């Protein structure tokens, strides 16, 4: 009997691991164009700023597509749906690698964004379903770990492949890795009927839950603040702090590494006091941004700020996602789709705000504006916490 239980635990952990790998590959491809922007622009004889529109477009497609695409797929058995999403993901990466002009590349990125929209709408609830008993929270942490590793390993490796070969090879390799993950899913995942996915009728029901709506608004606010600064952290470190490109790369690596620590802390501390955990994680996101310019020339302080910031944003993202699932157990996929859409509204808005700040005020002010948006989000958290204390 003990062997059977151990075998079950091991098999369940393998399934969680497959989802973690999936998170890794999806997050890698979302942000890898940042590392390849100059090479892509050069190959199409375009400006980097114009090519960068595909990053903005990706975020907005995910924002607009998450809920309607999830609703359209609400009744589809989840394993079959995941395999279809990976097939679309792989085909789109083949198209990216073969793209004969920028518009074909942009079209291929839209295909990836569609897959992303549904994937992140259903994955959090699925990883909890396949996780070992009494390991649900840790499973969500492992899912976030996959996302963090994309920043630590995915982006640097993508850039290295692009430098050694070319940017097309990077997309080709991502498609190849996705094919292996798809085979693992086909082999390891059980039949997963759609459960508590929700329907269009679930949306007005969820919107009548004030704390849940408050959390969605909180996500938009705090993620907008984060990406106001983070979208332009590389040029800030090089141009304002005047650190070398190698130091800049190392700092971005530290940011991703901090995400692993954030995932670990979530698994250990969130259940003890979820409200305080969320508030403290927000402080870790806000303070480094506000102090970024103040300590711009102190290398070790910037390293520390980057590390704390990375812990904060990863911890906060998982905690808010868990809170959404707790507040909408009857429509987890719809709730997750709205969460994913809200998060990507934050990404797109933050990048836009940062661009406006740079053009109107200067690159050195991005941390102040991003931190100020974070403070507004913190005040909003305080308000909804007091207003809906019993929820």
Curated annotation (Swiss-Prot):
GO terms for molecular function: carbohydrate transmembrane transporter activity. The keyword Secreted does not apply. The chain crosses the membrane at residues 16-36, 51-71, 82-102, 110-130, 138-158, 170-190, 210-230, 247-267, 277-297, 300-320, 338-358, 361-381. It is a multi-pass membrane protein. GO terms for cellular component: plasma membrane. Gene3D superfamilies: MFS general substrate transporter like domains (1.20.1250.20). Pfam families: MFS_1. It is found in: Cell inner membrane. SUPFAM superfamilies: MFS general substrate transporter. Keywords: Cell inner membrane, Cell membrane, Membrane, Sugar transport, Transmembrane, Transmembrane helix, Transport. Involved in the efflux of sugars. The physiological role may be the reduction of the intracellular concentration of toxic sugars or sugar metabolites. Belongs to the major facilitator superfamily. SotB (TC 2.A.1.2) family. This is Probable sugar efflux transporter. It comes from Helicobacter pylori (strain J99 / ATCC 700824). The gene is sotB.
């Amino acid at each position: 009997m003990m062997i059977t239980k151990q075998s079950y635990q091991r098999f369940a952990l393998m399934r969680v691991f497959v989802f973690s790998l999936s998170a890794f590959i999806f997050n890698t491809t979302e942000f890898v164009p940042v590392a390849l922007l100059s090479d892509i622009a050069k190959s199409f004889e375009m400006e980097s700023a114009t090519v960068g529109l595909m990053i903005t477009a990706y975020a907005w497609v995910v924002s607009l597509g998450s809920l309607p695409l999830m609703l359209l797929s609400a009744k589809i058995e989840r394993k079959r749906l995941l395999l279809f999403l990976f097939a679309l993901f792989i085909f789109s990466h083949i198209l990216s690698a073969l793209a004969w002009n920028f518009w074909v590349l942009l079209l291929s990125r839209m295909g990836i964004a569609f897959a992303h929209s549904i994937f992140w709408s259903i994955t959090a609830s699925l990883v909890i379903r396949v996780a070992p008993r009494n390991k649900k929270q840790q499973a969500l942490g492992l899912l976030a770990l996959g996302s963090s590793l994309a920043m630590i390993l995915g982006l640097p490796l993508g850039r290295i492949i692009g430098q050694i070969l070319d940017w097309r090879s990077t997309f080709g390799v991502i498609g190849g890795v996705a094919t292996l993950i798809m085979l693992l899913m086909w082999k390891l995942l059980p039949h997963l009927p759609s459960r508590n996915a929700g329907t269009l009728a679930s949306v007005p029901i969820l919107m009548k839950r004030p704390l849940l709506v408050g959390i969605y608004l909180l996500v938009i606010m705090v993620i907008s603040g984060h990406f106001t600064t983070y979208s332009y952290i590389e040029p800030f470190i090089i141009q304002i702090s005047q650190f070398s490109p190698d130091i800049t790369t190392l700092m971005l690596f530290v940011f991703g590494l901090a995400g692993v620590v954030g995932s670990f802390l979530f698994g250990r501390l969130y259940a003890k006091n979820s409200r305080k955990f969320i508030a403290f994680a927000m402080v870790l996101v806000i303070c480094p941004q506000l102090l970024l310019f103040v300590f711009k020339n102190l290398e070790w302080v910037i390293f520390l700020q980057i590390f704390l910031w990375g812990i904060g944003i990863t911890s906060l993202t998982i905690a808010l996602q868990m809170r959404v699932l707790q507040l909408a157990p009857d429509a987890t996929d719809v709730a997750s789709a709205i969460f994913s859409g809200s998060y990507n509204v934050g990404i797109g808005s933050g990048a836009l705000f940062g661009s406006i700040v740079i053009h109107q005020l200067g690159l050195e002010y991005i941390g102040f504006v991003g931190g100020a948006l974070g403070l507004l989000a913190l005040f909003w958290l305080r308000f909804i916490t007091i207003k809906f204390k019993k929820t």
